[in-house]
Each structure stands twice: as structure tokens, then as C-alpha cells.
Amino acid sequence: MSAFENIAEELKKLRQLQGWSQEDLARNLGVSFATVNRWENGKTKPSRLAQEKIKQVANTGK
């Protein structure tokens, strides 16, 4: 599994555990739906700043 695939899987897992749609996650991260979709499909990788925000959202649920 590539690094992109691993990040994509982990992001999708996080989102599903929270019961969120991609739109919900995008709203909580302050990014577009298209950005979350590209991350989950392994087309792009979140920036370091986005990865920090993802960690924050994962820990707080919002």
C-alpha cells in the first residue's frame, strides 16, 4: 500500500467513525468537498497544515 493509499484509507476511516459525509469533514476542516474527495481517492495528499487540522478534528470530533 502506498503512502497516498494509507492516508486515503485513514481519512475515510476517521470520517466514517464520526458518521460524517465528505461534505461534513470538509466543513470541519475548512476545505472544499472536492479537496476531501481527492484526498480519499488518493489523487492528492493533504498538506502538513491540513494533516495537523485532521489530527485536531480526529481528537475533538469537530
Predicted features along the sequence, with ranges:
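A short, Lys/Arg-rich alpha-helix, primarily the initiator
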Residues: 1-17, 55
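Short alpha-helical DNA-recognition segment
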Residues: 19-37
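DNA major-groove recognition helix of helix-turn-helix/homeodomain DNA-binding modules
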Residues: 47-62
